[in-house]
Structures are given as C-alpha cells and as structure tokens.
Amino acid sequence: MQQAPVILSTLDKLLNWGRSNSLWPLTYGLACCAIEMMATGGSRFDFDRFGTIFRASPRQSDVMIIAGTLTKKHAEFMRRLYDQMPEPKWVISMGSCANTGGMFNTYATVQGADRVVPVDIYLPGCAPRPETLQYALMVLQDKIRRSKAIKQDAPKRLV
C-alpha cells in the first residue's frame, strides 16, 4: 500500500514562490532607457518564461520599472501611480538618469527616483541592456523568496 507524498512547507515559502514567479511590471518609460525596456518585451528575450507580463495599469502591477530621467513634473504623477499599486510592491530604478539624475543636473530634474518612491533595485548604465534588466528581475525574484510574506504587526501599546 503506497501513501501519497506529503509536501511540507511554510505559508511564507509558498506565497513568496508565487509572488516571485509572477512579476507584473508597470512600464514607466521616460527616456532612452524605455527603448531598452521595450526591447525586453520582444521575442529575443522572452520575459514571459519568467512569469513577467508587462501591464499598463498600476492596479494590476506589483513591480514599477522607472526607466529614464524623472522630472519634477513627473514625480507627483509617478508617486500617485506607485500609491495605486497593491501591496506588496517593488521598484526597479533603470539607468543612470533614474538612479542619480544622470547628466541632467538641473532645477527641473529629480536627482534619483529614490527621493520620490522607495527603490529596491538599481540598474546602472546608460542605457542598461535588456540582459541587465533580466538579471535585475532574477535578483528581485531572489529577494522576494528570502523576504517574509506575512508581516507581523507590532503589538499595539495600550498606554
């Protein structure tokens, strides 16, 4: 008499496995890096095999990829899109301009996307190759697998 196999795991591991293998990025292309980001959606790089499906709606996305120069006019709009994304959410800053403002050191440019939203992964380069974005998504998958899926709320003080 054979018994059915038993799979032992934790709910954290199961949730993180599902989240890491179904990343749906919100495309937020602002400049040259957006062209490289668009190339990743083509058949040559095939991000679909990693469970990555680009979405146009923030309510259907869990990853925001900021690609290009962020101006102060765009900063408020980008923050609004970030706030509309469901939890948990992650942000990838793609390219030198999104990371530090790049060569645009003017009054109208935000010197890094991390001044507007919390950034999880920084991609260096001008403009980073699609392979670099692919590697960043794999690093993000690893980061998600190592995180705690179920957040424990801090005990509330009564006094």
UniProtKB/Swiss-Prot annotation:
The keyword NAD applies. Its main location: membrane. It is a peripheral membrane protein. Its cofactor is [4Fe-4S] cluster. It catalyses: a quinone + NADH + 5 H(+)(in) = a quinol + NAD(+) + 4 H(+)(out). Signal peptide: none annotated. Pfam families: Oxidored_q6 (PF01058). Disulfide bonds: none annotated. Keywords: 4Fe-4S, Cell inner membrane, Cell membrane, Iron, Iron-sulfur, Membrane, Metal-binding, NAD, Quinone, Translocase, Transport, Ubiquinone. It comes from the Bacteria. Its EC number is 7.1.1.-. Gene3D superfamilies: 3.40.50.12280. One of its GO terms (biological process) is aerobic respiration. It is found in: Cell inner membrane. [4Fe-4S] cluster binds at C32, C33, C97, C126. GO terms for molecular function: 4 iron, 4 sulfur cluster binding; iron ion binding; NADH dehydrogenase (ubiquinone) activity; NADH:ubiquinone reductase (non-electrogenic) activity; quinone binding. It is an enzyme of class 7 (translocase). Binds 1 [4Fe-4S] cluster. NDH-1 shuttles electrons from NADH, via FMN and iron-sulfur (Fe-S) centers, to quinones in the respiratory chain. The immediate electron acceptor for the enzyme in this species is believed to be ubiquinone. Couples the redox reaction to proton translocation (for every two electrons transferred, four hydrogen ions are translocated across the cytoplasmic membrane), and thus conserves the redox energy in a proton gradient. Belongs to the complex I 20 kDa subunit family. NDH-1 is composed of 14 different subunits. Subunits NuoB, C, D, E, F, and G constitute the peripheral sector of the complex. This is NADH-quinone oxidoreductase subunit B. It comes from Helicobacter pylori (strain J99 / ATCC 700824). The gene is nuoB.
